[in-house]
């Protein structure tokens, strides 16, 4: 049985990806979208979904417990896992930027950057010749400049509303982010025909979506 195991994040990305799979011609029961199960079997399509936290998707794919997965580019840039990036799905679009209190310069001696993306932040500041101290946080990143913990934050920006509501402004654009289809290298060889067919069908949906926005 040539079953495909697909790892996907719970929440908004799953909802958008589910709709895209439907448009691509996959027959998925309606209850899949509303299910609270962490593992969902679709025998008719020979597909199994594993639903997890966004940061865990590339881990499952790299270790082969999932053949393919859908992960944000932010997660892929941060983790640098051994996976194949097959397709930009053009969903959950946002970007990574630095932000801080308005009209404030970074500390010249030891600027501190708060973020949940330590590798992305370090690579960015190293690339522009800034020596910084990275403070890793897991939530409420916007608090860091407000309470004097950091000069800047590096975080995902979608609409900019959260920054504005907390009195912060953007300083530097770092990278665009969208959801990507990734594959385990061994699965890509062993189940290449199925995976390539999936990519072809999803790519058609992505192109149609883009043409509708022109």
UniProtKB/Swiss-Prot annotation:
Alphabetical list of Gene3D superfamilies matching this protein: Periplasmic binding protein-like II
GO terms, molecular function: ATP binding; ATP phosphoribosyltransferase activity
Alphabetical GO biological process terms: L-histidine biosynthetic process
Pfam families: HisG
UniProt superkingdom: Bacteria
Listed GO CC annotations: cytoplasm
Catalyzed reactions per annotation: 1-(5-phospho-beta-D-ribosyl)-ATP + diphosphate = 5-phospho-alpha-D-ribose 1-diphosphate + ATP
Primary location: cytoplasm
PROSITE patterns (alphabetical): ATP_P_PHORIBOSYLTR
Region forming the signal peptide: none
Tagged with keyword Acetylation: no
Listed EC numbers: 2.4.2.17
Pathway stated in the Swiss-Prot or TrEMBL entry: Amino-acid biosynthesis; L-histidine biosynthesis; L-histidine from 5-phospho-alpha-D-ribose 1-diphosphate: step 1/9
Enzyme class: transferase
Family annotation (InterPro entries): ATP_PRibTrfase_cat (IPR013820), ATP_PRibTrfase_CS (IPR018198), ATP_PRibTrfase_HisG (IPR001348), ATP_PRibTrfase_HisG_short (IPR024893)
Family: Belongs to the ATP phosphoribosyltransferase family. Short subfamily.
Known function: Catalyzes the condensation of ATP and 5-phosphoribose 1-diphosphate to form N'-(5'-phosphoribosyl)-ATP (PR-ATP). Has a crucial role in the pathway because the rate of histidine biosynthesis seems to be controlled primarily by regulation of HisG enzymatic activity.
Domain notes: Lacks the C-terminal regulatory region which is replaced by HisZ.
HAMAP family: HisG_Short
Subunit structure: Heteromultimer composed of HisG and HisZ subunits.
UniProt-recorded name of the protein: ATP phosphoribosyltransferase
Organism: Lysinibacillus sphaericus (strain C3-41)
Lineage: Bacteria, Bacillati, Bacillota, Bacilli, Bacillales
């Amino acid at each position: 049985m040539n079953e495909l195991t697909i790892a996907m994040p719970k929440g908004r990305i799953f909802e958008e990806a589910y709709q895209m799979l439907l448009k691509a011609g996959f027959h998925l029961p309606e209850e899949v979208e509303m299910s609270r199960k962490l593992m969902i079997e679709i025998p008719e399509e020979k597909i199994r979904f594993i639903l997890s936290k966004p940061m865990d998707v590339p881990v499952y794919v790299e270790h082969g417990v999932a053949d393919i997965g859908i992960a944000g580019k932010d997660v892929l840039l941060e983790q640098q896992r051994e996976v194949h990036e097959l397709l930009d799905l053009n969903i959950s679009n946002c970007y990574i930027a630095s932000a801080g209190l308005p009209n404030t310069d970074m500390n010249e001696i030891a600027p501190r950057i708060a973020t949940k993306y330590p590798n992305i932040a370090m690579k960015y500041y190293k690339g522009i010749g800034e020596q910084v101290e990275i403070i890793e946080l897991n939530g409420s990143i916007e608090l860091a400049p407000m309470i004097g913990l950091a000069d800047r934050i590096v975080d995902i920006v979608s609409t900019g509303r959260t920054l504005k509501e907390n009195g912060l402004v953007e300083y530097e654009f770092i990278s665009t982010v969208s959801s990507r289809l990734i594959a385990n290298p061994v699965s890509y060889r062993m189940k290449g025909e199925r995976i390539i067919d999936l990519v072809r069908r999803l790519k058609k949906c992505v192109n149609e979506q883009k043409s509708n926005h022109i």
